[in-house]
């Protein structure tokens, strides 16, 4: 298992929340969606990105 950081933009307060999830090294996007649905009040309809534990990047547009 590895630490995967899942960042979610909370549109209610315009802040980015970062969660740490334990996942297998071959995790897929669907795994993060399932984790969000089970462990937070966010769903896959929210905007989020994932990074492995060695790097967290933020892209501004």
Q: What does each model-identified segment do?
A:
Residues 2-26, 30:
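N-terminal acidic leader/helix
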